Amino acid sequence: MRTGRIAALMLSTVVALLGIGGCASSVLDVGYHPATAPNPPLRAVAQARRVVIRPVVDRRLDDTRIGPASKNGEAMVSRRPVVDIVRDALAAELTRAGYSMVAEGGDVVLAPEVEEFWIDVVSGYKTTLYVGRVVIALAVVDAASGERVLVRRYVAISRREGDENPKRAARDALEVALARALHDLATDPTIPAAFGSRSDPPARS
């Protein structure tokens, strides 16, 4: 009986270890670090200073990870939800440009979507290349009429080499790609133009 119990205990331990190994992941603490101060195009326009940002829609093909599995089977995942990272980055840029983020009653509404937030790993002869790619789609909606006045898409790529600290290289590649995508948004003159084209709310009787 004792031998049978020991065998059963050993078997359950092996199964548990296999389960842990199958769920192993490499967690990256990805954040947003603006590369430069916002350029004039995104400066707040007088007609629309209050902005509502809708929850970011995740359109990624695989929303469970941000990079491929490594040789040891660890998939790259983000410590924070990707939609939260993108929303916070967008809010940070708009706030720096002089806009006020509000939960409701805004002059304009932004409807963001994240299409890609991914790290590719390219193993070379002497070094490993980490390629971060971020794609964000953004719709500007007139709060008064509910009409979409602008739809834009921002694509950014960043490359980093890293063998001594692959985790940091992967994180840096993705953070720089995110910063570039937001920089493109911040310097896009069509955004404040769309904000300024909003309709006046209907007068109350």
What are these regions (language model features)?
Residues 76-100:
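Mid-chain, structured segments of secreted extracytoplasmic proteins
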Residues 1-23:
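Sec-dependent bacterial lipoprotein signal peptides
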Residues 55-61, 113-119, 154-157:
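Generic short beta-strand segments
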Residues 24-32, 97-149, 159-164:
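Surface-exposed short loop/turn segments
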Residues 65-81, 144-195:
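Short secondary-structure boundary motifs at beta->alpha junctions and helix caps
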Residues 21-84, 187-205:
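A structural "domain/chain start" motif
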